[in-house]
């Protein structure tokens, strides 16, 4: 499969305080087209926003696709590629037998990837990676309406 047949997705989440107001941002690239998405919530966590970025990106795809998701969140990458199998086997409990945090978002992410061929790639955050920097700016843009007025 050529690189032109792959949707490249860059995701990021941001939070002012943890918990606090937060936002998510997505940059999607397919061939010569780009699409930007962002949103936010009043009271959330950074991990929830990282998950929402990936979910929103995948849910925005109009047809089954080969997808490369680039994230600076090991929580998201490891959660969906490694930990989720054990969580499901253990009734959505973690290794300490506690309920998995953000289980509803993990289920939503799992459903969102089910029709796509997805590979997950970690990128170092805030390291002058242009596409990741754009996703970060979009996450901050998504968070902005929820920040207290100065």
Curated annotation (Swiss-Prot):
It comes from the Bacteria. It catalyses: Endonucleolytic cleavage to 5'-phosphomonoester. Keywords: Cytoplasm, Endonuclease, Hydrolase, Magnesium, Metal-binding, Nuclease. Its cofactor is Mg(2+). GO terms for biological process: DNA replication, removal of RNA primer. Binds 1 Mg(2+) ion per subunit. May bind a second metal ion at a regulatory site, or after substrate binding. One of its GO terms (molecular function) is RNA-DNA hybrid ribonuclease activity. The keyword Cell cycle does not apply. GO terms for cellular component: cytoplasm. It is found in: Cytoplasm. Its EC number is 3.1.26.4. InterPro entries: RNase_H, RNaseH-like_sf, RNaseH_domain, RNaseH_sf, RNaseHI. The keyword Magnesium applies. Signal peptide: none annotated. CDD domains: RNase_HI_prokaryote_like. Mg(2+) 2 binds at residues 12, 136. Monomer. Belongs to the RNase H family. NCBIfam families: PRK00203.1 (NF001236). Endonuclease that specifically degrades the RNA of RNA-DNA hybrids. This is Ribonuclease H. It comes from Parvibaculum lavamentivorans (strain DS-1 / DSM 13023 / NCIMB 13966).
